Amino acid sequence: MNTIKKIVAVLMVVAMAFTLTACGDTSWIVKVEGETVPSGVYIYYQTVGYTSAGYELAATDANYYYYMMYGMSYLDQKVGEKTVPEYMNDYALSMSKQYVVVERLFDELGLELTEDDKKLIDTQVNSLWNGNSEQFEKIGVGKESIRKVITNSAKEEKVFNAYYEVGGINGTTEDDIKAYLEDNYARVKYMTFNYADSADDAVDETRKNEALADAQSYLDRILAGEDVDTLIEEHQAEVNAANEESENTKPDLPDADGGEAEDNSAEDGAADDVEVEEPANPYPNESIFSKEATSPSEKFVNYVFTEIKVGEAKLVQDDINIYVVSKMDVLERTDIYEQNRDSFLVALFDKDFTSLVNERLEGYSVEVNEGSVKRYKAENAVEKPSEEQ
């Protein structure tokens, strides 16, 4: 009996030791279908989540672009209802789970990385590590974790293309991608006729009517068949002349020493004697606007997309300007399509791909290491500005 008790006691001690060891193991963050994702990958995704949070904040306040550019902290801000650290953790955990889904899809589809792919991965890993190794090591990200993330990203691209590239599982055609360009981008030439200095100012009806009449005269000439580029140049010359006249009516101010301002135009022009002939722009005066653009104004962009058809010219008015807008076929700009085709493909099917990954994930067993989640705080994944260290 005593022997049995001793054996049971030993087994209990071993079991407790195993349990404590398992609970204390923070080398991994999540297991999906038994496949383990290291904590270093999670921490790396936290840093990516911080950048993503910055872009989310900048979408409503452009000042956050400067925060990111100059390394200013925005950890104390909120993205929607989440604090930035909460956003980072959720982002990192989601990406860690998706990591495994991508790996499994890559294998299921029988995809492979080419030798060129592997060389590019090596280059990217070494470049990222060599430039940031000290910071990565400080926050707990090893070079192997960097390699895993970059390799997984390359695999994700191949999985995406297997589904959504032309000839892939989805049945995408080249016309589908071109339709995205046509639906989301507009190609225009336009002239601006200002009638107010600020949207907050009371409208000067006389000034507004003069701008409207001027704009209408140019629109009439376009509709009569005159060349748009020639009219734009004419209008710009009028604007320049008006600005020059306005400058000339200002009084000459003396220098700080009381003397007249020196005319250095001759000296200034000396450096401009050598002229370099630039190649002619095949698409002069053209602007390409995305449907999400807010400049020159949201009213302008919305009107261009909803009220002006390709081949038409119309007047557009916002709070401070009247515009003469001529809309052209964006698909005729083959250079835009060729240079941005891959980006259009991703934009077209990004949500579909995310849904595909999430649907796969729902059918998998997922185990989250709460000990690792508690240990690896989002704040520690962000390099603090020098004055905060």
Regions found by a protein language model. Give the residues of each.
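PPIase-associated folding chaperone regions across multiple families
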Residues: 25, 134-213, 217, 291-389
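Hydrophobic/aromatic residues in well-formed alpha-helices
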Residues: 42, 118-121, 146, 177, ...
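Bacterial N-terminal signal peptides that target proteins for export
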Residues: 1-8
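Sec/Tat-exported extracytoplasmic proteins
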Residues: 46-49, 53, 96, 100, ...
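N-terminal targeting/tethering segments
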Residues: 24-141
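C-terminal motif of bacterial Sec signal peptides marking the signal peptidase cleavage site
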Residues: 18-22
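Peptidyl-prolyl cis-trans isomerase
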Residues: 206-321, 329-341
